[in-house]
Amino acid sequence: MIKKTVIILLVGVLLFAQGIVYAAESLSLDSLIGEAKQNNPDILAAKKRWEASAARVPLSKSLEDPSIGFTFERIPRGTLKLNKTMPDDRMLTFSQFLPFFGKLSLKGKIAVVESQMFAAEHKAKELDIINQVKNAYYDLFMNDKEKELAQESLGLLEGVARVAEANYALGTISQEEVYKIHLEVARLNNALQNLEQEQSSKQTRLNTLLNRDPESSLGIPQLSEEASFEADIHSLDQSTVMNQPELLIFSYAIERNKHAKALAKRSFFPGLMASIVQRGITSGTLGPWDLMLSFSIPLWFWTKQKYEVKEAIANLGEAEAAYNAMQNRAFAEVKDLAVKAKIAKNKISLYKKNLIPMLENSIAASTAAFSSGKGDFMMLLDSQRMLVETKMNYYQALVEYNMNLADLERQVGGNLSEVKNEK
């Protein structure tokens, strides 16, 4: 009778442990990403730098401020009586410097390209923060699943401990085996405490990315294995060239240095200072006026303008080489992440379709055998432990897959769903 009660208790414990479900409010990743875009300080700071650079565009195309001067000529010696000068000797001068044709236009183009670089930096920061939010979300998901499986195992072992004590009373197992089970219970309790502390740290990390109170409560993250990844490598590379902010910044650097080279060549040409002088400004009628034109001559071009051009040419070459190097690194990273994502996807399929069902069937068979008095007690426990470990590996593969997709989206500069396969 006692043995039958022990068997029924063990079977009930196993079924209960496998059926634990924790209900809590789910945490939406999409809503977190939207909140980060709106509130993350790093994104907002990058946006303000972009806006500041856009404001510099009209400034770069503007003429220098003109100058206005007053001149009194032929003042009597030994006096400061300005009214003793002749009317035509009292003059108002207006002067304006005019750079050589095309210089202001090129400066404006350089400012526009620099503003585009800041726009790309803003996009890069946004993608980087989104990637950090996703990784923090996946870390929190993994922590939740580790807790769930640990609680499942703890519930099982606490029940098994009661069964073991009953079996020990019957004399069917040794006291050493009972001690081992209690040690395992203690280990799992300690692991759960550590996971609780880690959860607090991971929640703080996510809250700070959202610019929330670090101690704000969060729901339970959900992760679907339905995330698709079908794009071919060539399509991913094309998307990287078109959309990756870092590559765009290097591309804009090439364009900026081309304009800088053209501007340096124009430094060989003179600028014009135009002055208009109006005489008789204090008399009843205005007197004659004068026009004065002066030119800035690049007389020392062999030590100045010549090297401005050489510098611009070198900067252009450096920008082109840096772009090629960056592109090669990006292509290699895209390939690596795509392969890792496919490997993780294969692991998910292996665990879900093969290993987990096989272990569940094994536990069902072991439970039935033990209930009939033919099974081995420790073998049943080992099967349950293997199932928990396999589920853990499944969740790790799921997180790894989604993290690889997140890193891949960071590399290509946008959502993978927007990448079109080459036909």
Model segments located where?
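Bacterial N-terminal signal peptides that target proteins for export
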Residues: 1-9
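Periplasmic alpha-helical coiled-coil/stalk elements that build and connect Gram-negative outer-membrane
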Residues: 2, 125-241, 337-340, 344
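Bacterial N-terminal signal peptides
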Residues: 8-17
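Bacterial Sec-pathway N-terminal export signals of envelope proteins
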Residues: 21-72, 97-100, 214-258, 299, ...
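Acidic, low-complexity, intrinsically disordered peripheral segments
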Residues: 22, 30, 393-423
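Hydrophobic/aromatic residues within transmembrane alpha-helices of membrane transport systems
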Residues: 36, 46, 94, 140, ...
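Amphipathic alpha-helical coiled-coil segments
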Residues: 45-60, 125, 129-150, 159, ...
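Small/polar-residue-enriched beta-strand and adjacent coil segments characteristic
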Residues: 66-124, 248-260, 265-327, 337
